[in-house]
Each structure stands twice: as C-alpha cells, then as structure tokens.
Amino acid sequence: KLHPADQADAISDRPLQEQTDMLPTLSVDNAADVLEHLDEDEAAEIAAKLPLETLASLLDEMEPDEAADILLDLYEGRALAVMEKMVSTDNVRPLLEHEDDTAGGRMTTQVPILHRKMTASHAITYLRNSKPDSENHYYLYVVDKDRKLLGIVGLRELITAKPSVSVEVIMNSDVIRASVDDDQEECAKLMSHYNLMNLPIVNQINQLVGVITYDDLVEVIEDEATEDIYALANLSADSDLDVFSPVS
C-alpha cells in the first residue's frame, strides 16, 4: 500500500477533474491523509470541487489546523455550508479567527495538557484514557486551573518518575512559547534556533491555546534556512544561481 505522501504525488500529476473523481474512491481516513499531503493550493482546488458531504467527512478526519487551512481557502458561502455538514467544528472554529500566516492560524488546538497537581501515576492514566493525538506527544503541557501555561514534561520523564510525585515537581518551567498573533516566520525561527519539535502557543494572558508542530512549519523553516544560505552568499532568494557552472 502506498504511503499517503506517495499517493498525493500520484494524484497531483492528474488533471483536476480526475483528482476530484479519484479522492472519494479511497477510504475516508486515507483520502483525508492524501489531502493533507497535497500542496495547499492544489488541496484547495480539489476541495472547491468535491461534493459538500464528501468534503465535510474528509475535514472531520483531518487535523484541525489542516482542516482550517482548507476552509479558509474556500469562499465564505461554501465554507459555511461545509461546516454545517461536519460532525464537529469545535476544534476548527477557533483557528478560523486567525490569519493563516500567524501562530494562531498554524496551530492545532488538540493539545495534551496536565494539571500541575496531578501525580505522575494519575497523569499516565489520564493520557491512556484520553488517547491524545500522537503528533503532539513529544511534550506534555502543564497548566493551572485557568489553563495558564506553567511548564512542560517529557513523556519519558513522566514514565520514569515515581508514581506519587506531582507533575509540577518534574516539569520544566523554562518554556519557549509564542503568542497567538506572532508571525509564522518568527515561530519557525524559534523552532529552528531551539531545535524544537513542538511550540506551545499562548494568548495575551498566557493561557495555552494550541501547539505548532514541526510538520506544520517545515516549509517555512526550510525557506528560512534557504534565505540564510543566500544571505551568507550576498544573494537574494530569487537569484539565478547555477552551482554547477564552471569556474572562470
């Protein structure tokens, strides 16, 4: 079975009508994965052509941030019509309030959180029962009763801690974070500089509202790295540079 990324590559070579016809022939979860792996503009074109019910079922399966990106690319009337047919939009609606190129527009609201008074044993049981998305499992976020971000705990530290120790004892309170209104490039710079796989996003009063994963910003991070390389060579990113040209 082809990986969704490979399926996306195969579909992207087809005319738009064929793409629109092919996607619904896949299982819903598979089609949602393929749509996530397509170029954003291409995914938007397909989404604009799919039947409302089909698109709604795919968006229900997708990560909230990916679903929000597609909805923002649709004209408002179609986006509202699709959302009416979705099973739930609770995790998607907050993301639609932010510009696509900001932290709020890039983040996912599905965040594994722990309350500071939890014991390690209680926290592990809670995670086992809630089954949060594995995409966000690099770190768990510790909050107070008002959901204000206090610290982070690595899954390894949690598992190896004494069962009776409280989460606030083993958490790291020195947390790199970004504001919901920060530009995506600033977030990419933070993640690249500190070698982060996840970046917690907070609002103006330090409440945890979401998290950005490396995958969410990989293209932005790569673009930043390319710009740095060109800057070192005193070239613009639009320069016509042929690295294989002979030295005169």
Name each model feature, range by range:
Residues 1-235:
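Hydrophobic packing positions in regular secondary-structure scaffolds
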